[in-house]
Amino acid sequence: MAASAVTARYGTLHNTSMAVVSLGMIVVAIVHFLSNPANAPTLSLNDPRFALFLMLAMAMLYYVFQGVTRTLNREPQVVIDHDGIRLGFGRNKSFTWDDIVWVRLRRLALRPQLEIGLADQAFITANLRLSMWSFDDSLRPVRGQPTTLLVRDNGLDTKSSAMLDAVRSFRPNLVK
């Protein structure tokens, strides 16, 4: 029996909830200041409270945007099949099984994350534009392992353990 491909898309519930909660936080702050005008900051950048709430509102609007765009994006972000692993997340890079040296689960806080060790040349050629400072990116570098990337399943509809099981079904020799 041939193994079937596993795909992971952005989860609708998670990302819609993120957008709704972020928008709700902005609305609650506005309603609070409208009902308590004595506590409201003055509409001037010279008032540090206004500057703080403006920055917080911009951050929350960013998460509203992220939640809505991810909810509407139904493209697979991770595909594991007989050809290898394809990663989306705005990069759309494919790695054949020959490019992948090993795969394992790594615990990051409480959640397991899929860690993929790539061959040096495959990692360099892919130019994944990874950043340690991007908190929203589902692809992260692993400190101390230059050709390894971490696939975070936060906001995806498939858990990392299911992705590891898919790798195991196609190439059991790669699982650490």
Question: Where would I find each of the regions flagged by the language model?
Answer:
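Pocket-edge structural micro-motifs
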Residues: 10, 89, 153
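N-terminal membrane-targeting/pre-transmembrane regions
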Residues: 1-47, 165, 169, 175-176
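Short, conserved beta-turn/loop elements at beta-strand boundaries and strand-helix junctions
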Residues: 105-109
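Conserved beta-hairpin
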Residues: 61-104
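A membrane-cytosol interface segment of integral membrane proteins
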Residues: 111-176
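Generic detection of short hydrophobic beta-strand segments and adjacent strand-loop junctions
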Residues: 4-8, 95, 147-151
